[in-house]
Amino acid sequence: MFKVAILDDYQNVSQQFVDLEKLSGKYEFKIFSEPFIDEVDAINQLADFEALLIMRERTPMTKNLIDNLSKLKFIITSGLRNKSIDLEATKKKKVIVCGTEINIHPTPELTWALILGLARNFKEEIDNMYQGYWQTTVGIELKGKILGLIGLGRVGSQVAKIGKAFGMQVMAWSENLNLDSCKELDVLPS
């Protein structure tokens, strides 16, 4: 049976997205929800696995780790890129590396939750509410304010659209800023 290790699944998200039971006839899965003590510990615990499903850049896939996993054939990372994977080492060892599609919506949503929380003093207001007080601060209005973005790719453009919906002036900077995208989104290049 093909052995698959799911690494660094601290939040148990792998089981929310994949029905591991459905795949259990062909694959044997083991979920590692805690970080490894060190690289030697990782080598010892991962020695029998043919595939590693890695969450983000939590466990570095170094040359030493890759070289010492003799059965390793595949590394699949969440998202399209993972800078913690030594691609030269995987290439030399003929380990196939691939990523998953990314869902761009959570990042702009979290970005706006944080912006709104800061603008409206959520932390202070929640703390005060627990002490019996109500509306102890005055937040700031976003309409008319300037929102600066670094990058106007898939995530940045979503953040920009929401900023425009709040009536904000949006500015963006990037080394490879696309002026057509700026015009399309009504964003000022910086």
Regions found by a protein language model. Give the residues of each.
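Phosphate-coordination loops involved in phosphoryl transfer and adenosine-cofactor binding
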Residues: 1, 72, 143-146
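N-terminal glycine-/charge-rich "phosphate-binding" loop or analogous flexible N-terminal tail
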Residues: 1-51, 55-56
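Cofactor-binding loop segments of dinucleotide-utilizing enzymes, especially the Rossmann-like FAD-
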Residues: 7-9, 34, 80, 152, ...
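Structural motif corresponding to alpha-helix initiation and N-cap regions
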Residues: 17, 36-40, 58-63, 84, ...
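Short loop/helix-cap segments at secondary-structure boundaries that form the rim of catalytic
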Residues: 17-23, 67, 85-92, 177-185
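Hydrophobic beta-strand scaffold residues
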Residues: 29, 96-97, 170, 189
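Phosphate/diphosphate ligand-binding glycine-rich loop within oxidoreductases
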Residues: 49-126, 130, 139-140
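Rossmann-like dinucleotide/phosphate-binding beta-alpha-beta segment
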Residues: 137-190
